[in-house]
Regions:
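Hydrophobic C-terminal alpha-helix "anchor/cap" residues
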Residues: 19-23, 154, 197
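Short acidic, glycine-rich surface-loop motifs adjacent to enzyme active sites
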Residues: 194-202
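Generic alpha-helical hydrophobic packing signal
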Residues: 33, 172-174, 196
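Short linear motifs at secondary-structure transitions and domain/linker junctions
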Residues: 4-8, 56-66, 148-154
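Subtilisin-like serine protease catalytic core
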Residues: 63, 73-188, 200
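Aromatic/histidine-rich interaction motifs
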Residues: 1-15, 35
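Short, acidic/polar
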Residues: 15-19, 189-193
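Protease zymogen maturation seam
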Residues: 17, 21-86, 94-104, 132
Length: 202
């Protein structure tokens, strides 16, 4: 439109005052803020689309209460996570070979996978994805299932034709096994996992 104008303001209060002043001046037919919009970051993963993951988006499916969810689509408008963020999952380990998790795993830059050496000299051999504090090894493979489910809720891969999607699908997962196959945890093992996480940037 030829007679339109765009003004800018540095802060929200200044913008609000300017808008109110322009609206009451009778000089303009319409005065509106110039808002930023973006395409929604809604993944195409099956369980999200069909409502099975009702905790992420509840539209009342299966007799549920519409809106009784975590509001994840609003969060995704802000961020889907960052590959620079490492989330330490201190649990029963992670099945890091899972098709929705393999690409999401943090990788220890100081370790060479499969060479049976403690390359980074931290006391754990081949701790590529994290550690197993239960057995004091570098293999945090889940033998219970709980840690894998938690990891999937956090960062299951998106838009990959698989059914699941995580809340922050762009972060990296560090697998820290403090719980055994029966789901029992020792506080010393949890502490060791916390130390490893902090030491390695989680």
């Amino acid at each position: 439109v030829d007679d339109s104008r765009v003004a800018s303001s540095l802060d929200a209060e200044g913008l609000r005052q300017r808008l109110n002043g322009l609206r009451t001046s009778d000089l303009f037919s319409f005065v509106e803020p110039n808002r930023v919009g973006r395409i929604a970051s809604v993944p195409n993963d099956g369980y999200f689309q069909d409502g099975t993951l009702w905790g992420l988006r509840n539209a009342g499916q299966n007799g549920g209460t519409p809106g009784a969810d975590i509001g994840v689509t609003n969060a995704w408008d802000i961020t889907i996570g960052s590959t620079n963020v490492i989330v330490a999952v201190i649990d029963t380990g992670i099945r890091y070979t899972h098709s929705d998790l393999a690409s999401q795993m943090w990788r220890n830059p100081g370790e060479t996978a499969g060479d049976n050496q403690d390359n980074d000299k931290n006391g754990f051999v081949d701790d590529v994805f994290g550690i197993n504090a239960v057995n004091n090894t570098g293999d945090p493979l889940d033998d219970n299932g709980h840690g894998t489910r938690v990891a999937g809720i956090i960062a299951s891969a998106a838009n990959n034709g698989r059914p699941h999607v995580g809340v922050a699908w762009n972060v990296r997962l560090m697998a820290l096994k403090a719980g055994n196959s029966a789901g029992q945890f020792l506080s010393a093992d949890v502490a060791q996992c916390v130390y490893y996480a902090v030491t390695n940037g989680a």
